[in-house]
């Protein structure tokens, strides 16, 4: 064997060593990641725990079982039709045990944003949700538009007023509490606020500021003050895009339930960590993998 041939063979062998060493390292890293304990569960509400005033199958008992594990529980929701207190009362009325501090909603995040930015918005939100926001300053012109789920407010004159506020000054903000395409009611799917947000964007030539899911900050802020990394958390939800894809993009595990607004033709990319029939089965999976 010549010196040149020997040197070439050495390089090939060295490449193989590096290849298999890296392959083993990556594999070990993946296994370690999968075996990391679940320390927190972020749970969607509408469509996951309940549909209107009806809990999903065995959801009330499943939540009790999950609490017994000691896992941190936060309810992360884009629900914007009602104030946090009204939402809390309604959930308790249908059997769920939870505290107001456990609800992390896009509505409350939007309230904090309005306060922080010292805005004087025109609100396209329900009358009940409006009570969470600070009062308008009648001495100042409106300088922004806040949009939530407000079926009774989405009529032409209101939308036209919002359009003109945005059009009057390029610095006026369009704040989308969330951009849901649709949500689940007892009588089927219904339009969410997303189409109205996009309509205002198109007509006024502006881009909205998204507050709720799937905003990365919204998921991370649910864990504020907790010594828990996103890799130790699961997100349970019915919305393929906002719940599952949004959470997994941040680094959480995603448990897709087939209740609520779930549609089999809407596929998550990347796929969810696991897909189950309902919230109760999601809890079973967590108990098996804790």
Predicted regions located by residue number:
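Asp-based, Mg2+/Mn2+-dependent phosphohydrolase catalytic module
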Residues: 33-43, 50-69, 82-104, 108-290
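Non-catalytic pre-domain segments flanking phosphatase-related domains
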Residues: 2-7, 13-43
């Amino acid at each position: 064997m010549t010196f040149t041939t020997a040197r070439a063979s050495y390089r090939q062998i060295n490449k193989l060593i590096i290849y298999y060493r890296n392959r083993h390292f990556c594999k070990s890293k993946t296994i370690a990641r999968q075996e990391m304990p679940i320390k927190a569960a972020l749970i969607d509400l509408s469509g996951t725990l309940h549909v209107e005033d009806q809990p999903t199958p065995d959801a009330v008992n499943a939540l009790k079982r999950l609490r017994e594990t000691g896992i941190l529980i936060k309810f992360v929701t884009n629900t914007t039709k009602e104030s946090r207190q009204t939402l809390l009362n309604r959930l308790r009325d249908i059997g769920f045990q939870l505290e107001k501090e456990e609800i992390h909603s896009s509505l409350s995040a939007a309230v904090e944003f309005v306060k922080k930015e010292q805005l004087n918005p025109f609100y396209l939100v329900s009358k009940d949700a409006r009570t969470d926001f600070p009062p308008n300053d009648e001495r100042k012109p409106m300088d922004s538009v806040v949009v939530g789920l407000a079926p009774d407010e989405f009529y032409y004159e209101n939308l036209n007023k919002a359009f003109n506020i945005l059009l009057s000054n390029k610095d006026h903000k369009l704040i989308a509490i969330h951009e849901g395409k649709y949500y689940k009611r007892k009588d089927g799917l219904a339009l969410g606020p997303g189409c109205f947000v996009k309509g205002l964007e198109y007509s006024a030539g502006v881009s909205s500021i998204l507050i709720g899911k799937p905003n990365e900050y919204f998921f991370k802020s649910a864990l504020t003050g907790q010594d828990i990394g996103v890799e130790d958390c699961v997100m349970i939800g019915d919305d393929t895009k906002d719940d599952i894809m949004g959470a997994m993009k941040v680094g959480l595990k995603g448990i897709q339930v087939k209740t609520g607004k779930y549609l089999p033709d809407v596929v998550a990319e990347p796929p969810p960590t696991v897909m189950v029939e309902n919230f109760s089965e999601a809890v079973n999976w967590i108990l098996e993998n804790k």
